[in-house]
């Protein structure tokens, strides 16, 4: 059985933490931030402002027509690529924590309403963990996004 206090952490990571007696407070992410390239920054900012607000994630910074950052520590960025046109990474996706299942559902609905594509309807994903509830979408540039509640 998993210890209380590990919600929001992937089940495989939870197992590792428990096997090594690592607390959530001691656990450090290896990434500082992630960014995705978009073809139209203002349109992408509207899309991400709307979709991420369903997960209680707010835009924290904006450089007009260049990039926008989300999260308290600017963990997620959308922006125009420095070189060449924006293209999505095959096999890449960004997963955002959701506060509850309803937020996952709202993330999915909002993304589709704004021109995103379904990449996996909201539902339980027992192959990732007993309580892993997620939805997958692609933004208008083809970037794959996930909202997950555990």
Predicted regions and their residues:
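Residue-identity detector for glycine
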Residues: 5-8
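Short, Lys/Arg-enriched N-terminal segments with co-localized hydrophobic residues
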Residues: 11-28
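N-terminal beta-strand motif that seeds the catalytic metal site of vicinal oxygen chelate
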Residues: 23-45, 94
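Short, flexible turn/loop "capping" segments at secondary-structure junctions
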Residues: 26-29, 84-88
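Core segments of cupin and vicinal oxygen chelate
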Residues: 35-76
């Amino acid at each position: 059985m998993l210890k209380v206090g590990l919600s929001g952490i992937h089940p495989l990571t939870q197992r590792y933490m428990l096997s090594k007696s690592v607390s959530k407070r001691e656990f450090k992410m290896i990434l500082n931030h992630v960014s995705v390239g978009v073809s139209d920054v203002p349109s992408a900012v509207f899309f991400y402002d709307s979709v991420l607000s369903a997960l209680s994630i707010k835009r924290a910074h904006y450089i007009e027509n260049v990039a926008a950052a989300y999260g308290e520590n600017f963990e997620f960025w959308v922006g125009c690529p420095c070189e060449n046109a924006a293209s999505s990474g095959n096999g890449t996706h960004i997963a955002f924590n959701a506060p509850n299942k309803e937020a996952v559902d709202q993330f999915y609905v909002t993304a589709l309403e704004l021109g995103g594509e379904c990449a996996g309807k909201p539902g339980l994903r027992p192959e990732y963990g007993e309580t892993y509830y997620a939805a997958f979408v692609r933004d208008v540039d083809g970037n794959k996004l996930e909202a997950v509640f555990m």
